Amino acid sequence: MNKEELLEYIDNNSTAVTNFKDKVRADQQAKNKKRQPAKRWNDARIERQVDKFTDQFIGNIYDKLARAIKANNHTPKERWIKFIEENELLDDLEESVSMIDFEEE
C-alpha cells in the first residue's frame, strides 16, 4: 500500500481526512483574515496549504503504520487493511482528529 492508497482507504472508510481538512481550512482562513488586505491569500493558495498539511498528515500515518506492520514494497494491501481493522485505527484516528486544535503561533 502506498500513501495515495492509504489516503483513499481512510477517506472511503472514515471521516478523519475530511474532518482534518475542514480544521486546517478553518485555521488557514482565520490566519488569512489577520493578514493585511494586500497580503491575504486567495482561496487557491489556502487549498494548497490544506493539501500540504493533509499530505504531511497522511505521510506521518503511513510511516507509523509501515513501521508497526514492518512493511516493505512487497507487503500486500490486505495486510495493511487487516492491521488497521484489527487495531481499530480508523476510530482512533477520528477521535484524534476531533481533538486537534490548531493554536496560534
Question: Which residue stretches match the model-derived regions?
Answer:
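Short acidic DE-rich linear segments
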Residues: E4, I100-E105
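Generic detector of leucine side chains in alpha-helical contexts
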Residues: L6-L7, L65, L89-L93
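Acidic, low-complexity, intrinsically disordered interaction modules
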Residues: Q28-E88
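Short terminal alpha-helical segments
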Residues: N2-K34
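C-terminal non-catalytic accessory extensions
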Residues: D91-D101
